[in-house]
Amino acid sequence: MIIRSPESEVKIVVDRDPVKTSFEEWAKPGHFSRTIAKGPDTTTWIWNLHADAHDFDSHTSDLEEISRKVFSAHFGQLSIIFLWLSGMYFHGARFSNYEAWLSDPTHIGPSAQVVWPIVGQEILNGDVGGGFRGIQITSGFFQLWRASGITNELQLYCTAIGALVFAGLMLFAGWFHYHKAAPKLSWFQDVESMLNHHLAGLLGLGSLSWAGHQVHVSLPINQFLDAGVDPKEIPLPHEFILNRDLLAQLYPSFAEGATPLFTLNWSKYAEFLTFRGGLDPTTGGLWLTDIVHHHLAIAILFLIAGHMYRTNWGIGHSLKDILEAHKGPFTGQGHKGLYEILTTSWHAQLSLNLAMLGSLTIVVAHHMYSMPPYPYLATDYGTQLSLFTHHMWIGGFLIVGAAAHAAIFMVRDYDPTTRYNDLLDRVLRHRDAIISHLNWACIFLGFHSFGLYIHNDTMSALGRPQDMFSDTAIQLQPIFAQWIQNTHALAPSATAPGAIASTSLTWGGADLVAVGGKVALLPIPLGTADFLVHHIHAFTIHVTVLILLKGVLFARSSRLIPDKANLGFRFPCDGPGRGGTCQVSAWDHVFLGLFWMYNAISVVIFHFSWKMQSDVWGSISDQGVVTHITGGNFAQSSITINGWLRDFLWAQASQVIQSYGSSLSAYGLFFLGAHFVWAFSLMFLFSGRGYWQELIESIVWAHNKLKVAPATQPRALSIVQGRAVGVTHYLLGGIATTWAFFLARIIAVG
């Protein structure tokens, strides 16, 4: 830390009324672009309108104006999020069986949607228990509401209305900070103030308020619920907050108030700030008292972190200094110049944020099942499968987005004249070594991982099981993963003596938590089958990275097209007369990367779905005998490609294929329709623009003959547009197909 004389004070400066509010202007399609605002000559106009509406770089080159538009758009995004949340809470209040579920979560399924009986649609409302007929939901909201201490539908109504108010507030803020008081560029570039406020405010106070809410509202209410008290008999939240004696009956240390805090006698609070580990056997979720403790600790860390950066007080870290001091022995100028990049290129900034958030989202997917945070979440298999799948897909998309914006930064914002011998320049200078090595790794992983499966399929077909790679023949045990599992399983007695159980039951040991005769979680064994599929994961991830990284590193130039930067972010080919230069733009790398991301995530969610049904989920008898949904067939079946096709895809598709005539029939229709959407994408991906242009021209001829030709000239989609439409339908169709397949299966058997 460097202490200096105070620099120029940070002032919050805004421009008053910079842009007039004009509904006339907004009503004109394409008002942000001179060419688009002229109106359509050809049908390409509508595509350009959509492509450029949010590409603020194309509206103006003024960084301040771009920053204001992005800032304003963020408020619009928040408004939509609040609106969506409000809708979720409103459905919980108006159409759900939340109160019934709350009184008996093990026998009643969550439902918050009842289908209107139009032309026989009442079949879709299945019996979820307790005499309620509706669609079983798998969003996890009920479990979250219970963990928050919500006990009746009125509270859900109030929250829904509150979220609507906030949605309106956000819309107003977006308008106000663009049209009435727009911040100056210096405000957007003041990273130290931004870090302090985001760390201390959003993360610090956010975590602290959640911890406070849990201590004063959630914990007491959940204690009553766990003890079987009728939700209507439980005191209301404000009674716990206002009446300390009420809390002291549940947690005696409350009688002493804040005295233990200020006298450093913190162990008094160990009643509700615990460090137990494992799961609560009543609910199958993490101990809520552990969660409170965690959020309190996080809050303190971030409140401290939010006071670390130098603003007007001449004390603390300066980010520019930190970055410029960051030099290694082989990295030349190191991070010098990175500060300027990240404060003038929002694409570079966004790219980093997307990469981090994408990785974090995938981490969330893995923690939601291994450390289920909410009561009765672990035994709701449909919700568990949905949460994992959802967070995996979202994480994959965000990471591809990171590569997309990194490439846009390279094309639009990177200035090669000022960047010399810093880290980025050095990476670009040895990009050939990076990409060729990565390519070799992909080839190695691909041939070896699939080679192991092909070997097994061949031996299986020839009737030689003793020569297969399996737990019962030639073993390929994941010894490093097992070592990590074992280390964590032993932690409570060794490195974490204060904990009663390890962080997750999945690590190992003898613990099993079951709620209402259903397994919540148990130690997950890893064997040869997992070793094989993990190498498929490694392969697909490396190929995705290869495609995306090649797109970023070769975004400005390559041996094939040295002047690529002049062609822009997306272009079909390097003009006529240069064959073999198609699919080289940075955009095309994102396009191709999306398919491999889809491959990678598909294998992950298939692995998860089958592994959990085979080795974790199931029922437990009074004698303690566990019967898994697919009877532990993963270890022996998933070691051949035929096993994946026969015992996973085909065997588990029976529920969605046979869903007609049952309350799951909607999933059967979605399964069919999504397959169609997926197949429709191939029409765009496997045909050239010229084919369609020829077809269109003969159709236009027919229109002219009949004198019904439109004024706007029809045009075939451009090559890039066709690919965009193709990949969108491919992903949408594929994801919706998987969704229908998973849910019909798990709701039927789980």
UniProtKB/Swiss-Prot annotation:
Phylloquinone binds at W692. The chain crosses the membrane at residues 70-93, 156-179, 195-219, 291-309, 346-369, 385-411, 433-455, 531-549, 589-610, 664-686, 724-744. Keywords: 4Fe-4S, Chlorophyll, Chloroplast, Chromophore, Electron transport, Iron, Iron-sulfur, Magnesium, Membrane, Metal-binding, Oxidoreductase, Photosynthesis, Photosystem I, Plastid, Thylakoid, Transmembrane, Transmembrane helix, Transport. GO terms for biological process: photosynthesis. Pfam families: PsaA_PsaB. One of its GO terms (cellular component) is chloroplast thylakoid membrane. It is a multi-pass membrane protein. Belongs to the PsaA/PsaB family. This is Photosystem I P700 chlorophyll a apoprotein A1. The gene is psaA.
